[in-house]
């Protein structure tokens, strides 16, 4: 298994719009395409506040590529972007790391 850590540095004045987009559009479309989301977190204290962090689980890189390709071409996602994006940018920067567990990790 592989794990993807995704951290979004959010635009402060538009951070609630990002949460709305995830709750109402992103998460349902993730479910539709079989994304395995291990959790979502919002930074409470930290140098890059506000941030949205989440972890995805993948069998391999091919699965990641296939599911993200389907996600980004999904008509529901394209409509969500059309509706939400004119409200202004939500994200300043995206950090993404693909990780695999160490042999001593409980996440095997």
Place the predicted regions along the sequence by residue:
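Short hydrophobic/aromatic beta-strand micro-patches
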Residues: 9, 55-57
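Active-site acidic-Proline motif in GNAT/NAT acetyltransferases
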Residues: 12
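An amphipathic, aromatic/His-enriched active-site/gating alpha helix that lines ligand/cofactor pockets
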Residues: 16-38, 59-97
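The conserved glycine-aromatic submotif of the RRM
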Residues: 47-53
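Intrinsic disorder/low-complexity detector
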Residues: 1-5, 9, 41, 46-47, ...
